[in-house]
Amino acid sequence: MTEANELAGKVQSDQAPASEKPEEAIKSRKLEWMQKYIHHPGLMIGLTILLLLVLIAIAAPVLAPYSPTDTDLGNTLAHPSSAYWLGTDQFGRDVLSRIIWGSRISLQVALAVVFISLTLGTIIGAVAGFAGGWLDRVIVVINDILLAFPGFLLALALVAARGSSLESVVTAVSIAFTPRVAAVMRSVVLTIKPRLFIESSRAIGMSPARILFCHIVPNAMPPVIVVATVSAATAILAEAGLSFLGLGVQPPTATWGNIISDGNATITTNPLISFSAGLCIAIAVIALNMLGDGLRDTLDPQMRRQTGRIL
């Protein structure tokens, strides 16, 4: 009798989720996703650091004690003090103020590059994988040619051809990273296209465009979002490298790359200028990589076991 009662209890517990209301099922699913995010330390640490950097960039006019372009030739290369927490550069500009304002440029470049490369790469990769045929072959050939060049080298050539400006940096880095997003999107679309729910959509007469953008693309976005997040970190490095070489945002605009370039002349006597900007770049890149790893583990747990790192 006891065993029968236990068996009946198990059956009732197994059948309980089936009788759950749709609203409760959606709520429980949202709670499950929130628990996954909260219990992933890397994702939370990366997201927290990134949010702090964004807040610092937004509040730069309030947080920065001085203007990033104001010079004081009577107080050049000053060591850290209560007036200048990180000292001054060879033009008497406050290093801390320039670093705070420089975060704006780096985050603007990262955000713009992610938006442009994610949009273009998603459309190009989705159309190539879904259409197939000669269009797919042409896109793959062009994509492979662009991928054959290192991303930074391609961005360097494009900036040199267009001229040094913030718009040129964003355009060049976006063009360099779009093929990577397109390649990932195409490969995921090819795995989703033969699935049963796609064939069922075709059978009921759904248009190809609706199938692609309403069913395939949303299901293919998780790995693409991860690639875009990691690309944001690479975009910050690319902008800093281009500015360091004098091909990025031009002085006296404060960027982390320009600060490193300015401090390079006094690296032996006052290394804090270059070190502080380099540390900010490292923190931002590490935070974005931690965020990308966390999103990968949360959105697609099998991706880490099957393919390792995406980039």
Predicted feature residues:
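Amphipathic cytosolic juxtamembrane alpha-helices at the membrane-cytosol interface
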Residues: 93-108, 112, 132-140, 190-194, ...
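Generic hydrophobic transmembrane alpha-helix motif, especially the helices
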Residues: 85, 89, 119-123, 129-195, ...
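Glycine-rich helix-loop "coupling/hinge" segments at transmembrane-helix boundaries
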Residues: 147, 158-162, 173, 188-189, ...
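Structural signal for membrane-spanning alpha-helices in multi-pass inner-membrane proteins
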Residues: 57-61, 155, 159, 226, ...
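Gly/Trp-centered helix-boundary motif
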Residues: 1-122, 126-127, 134, 148, ...
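Hydrophobic core positions of alpha-helical segments in small-molecule transporters
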Residues: 45-49, 109-113, 139-142, 155, ...
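Alpha-helical transmembrane segments of multi-pass membrane proteins
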Residues: 53-57, 159-160, 173-180, 230, ...
